[in-house]
Amino acid sequence: MSEAESCEETSKEHRIWKKNVPYLYDTVVTKEVEWPSLSVQWMPDVTKTENSDSSMHRMIHGTHTCGGVQNHLMISKFTITTDTPEFDDAKWDSEREEFGGYGEGSAAKWDTEIKINHPGEVHRARYMPHNPFIIASRGPSDDVYIFDYTKHPSEPKDTKFRPQLRLKGHEGEGYGMSWSNTREGHLLTAGDDGMICHWDINANQTISGQIVPQSKFKGHSSNAEDVSFHALHNFVFGSVGDDRKLNLWDLRQSKPQLTAVGHTAEVNCITFNPFSEYILATGSVDKTVALWDMRNMRKKMYTLKHHNDEIFQVSFSPHYETVLASSGSDDRVIVWDISKIQDPSSSSAASSDSVPPEVIFIHAGHTGKVADFSWNPNRPWTICSSDEFNALQVWEVSNSLVSSEKWETEMI
């Protein structure tokens, strides 16, 4: 398929998606930003507005500029209605054959609250769970940066870069980053130098605000693409890399405690289940998500297949134990329910050309590679996702598609 044919096919698919928006979502809001964002994360706070039907949420994102334009780490606030919107025939655009502005009532507002100068594009930015005012970021340099965003004005007064801390220990750029949920101030980063660095931002620092790693781990023969603390254990973490390896580590040991190779190409991302101490998932260039059980790492527990291109992000839902999502170069975010996985030997299992039963939703609102996404911690089926064509999207799966006794029971 030529590039022109590919663009036409993408455009056609997007038009079809737009026509079906009212049936698939309770909310879809697209923000066309000036520059693409490689990173996005909801923050944990939520504020009820004066209008009781709305709530205000914050998110972290960044810029990827070109031509010498200043990059920024950004905090934005998003106001979203709490009521399920009604299907409105008046929103049908007969000329374009689509519904417009669905879920974008007067309560849906998106405003930039804080902009912080950043040296180069923001590869990844994540807040510290124990103090969400503290944000770590990565860019195209060796260093990792720590910001307290309460110490920065809403707009920078000049072009000077003013992080609260610089973490110095890598010898190359990177994307992987993970804060500990159980130990305040502890951070892991992965880099193209193949190293994993463990930091304690509360440790002694130099006069110039620099910190060196508490420890460094070498377990990959090429780029270390991602790293993640275990959600429930103090010292357990995992890393993945271009050598196709999944390594499981103990912070107190210098070597991986377990190593597995379950993908046929580079592994880009890793996530631990926040409800189960044994289950984790990895996403790969081979277009699959692998599920793993730490009690038996000799083989994958299951392979999730429905992406058409490499996967860049995977994340378990913070609300439901069996739900996770993944995104990548096929412009899609796929939501999976692993409790729906069928026995591969069963005659009722999905064929290779059908949608597997574990796929419960496909978000097709993007027209370019989905660089990152984030589950909203306060709204169970709401996700923010970003793509390479300057779109940030907030979308909420229709309650009619996911409402069931199972989900209601899990939320009690």
Curated annotation (Swiss-Prot):
Main location: nucleus
Observed effect of gene inactivation: RNAi-mediated knockdown results in delayed cell cycle progression.
Gene3D superfamilies, per the entry: YVTN repeat-like/Quinoprotein amine dehydrogenase
Keywords of this entry: Chromatin regulator, Developmental protein, Nucleus, Repeat, Repressor, Transcription, Transcription regulation, WD repeat
Compartments in which it is found: Nucleus
InterPro entries: G-protein_beta_WD-40_rep, Histone-bd_RBBP4-like_N, WD40/YVTN_repeat-like_dom_sf, WD40_repeat_CS, WD40_repeat_dom_sf, WD40_rpt, WD_repeat_RBAP46/RBAP48/MSI1
Cellular component GO terms, alphabetical: ESC/E(Z) complex; nucleus; NuRD complex
GO molecular function terms listed in the Swiss-Prot or TrEMBL record: histone binding
Ranges of the WD repeats in the UniProt entry: 117-157, 169-209, 219-259, 262-302, 306-346, 365-405
Pfam families recorded: CAF1C_H4-bd (PF12265), WD40 (PF00400)
Function in brief: Core histone-binding subunit that may target chromatin assembly factors, chromatin remodeling factors and histone deacetylases to their histone substrates in a manner that is regulated by nucleosomal DNA. Plays a role in regulating cell cycle progression. Required to repress the induction of vulval development by Ras signaling. In association with the zinc finger protein ztf-11, negatively regulates the expression of non-neuronal genes during neurogenesis.
Family: Belongs to the WD repeat RBAP46/RBAP48/MSI1 family.
Protein name: Probable histone-binding protein rba-1
Gene for this chain: rba-1
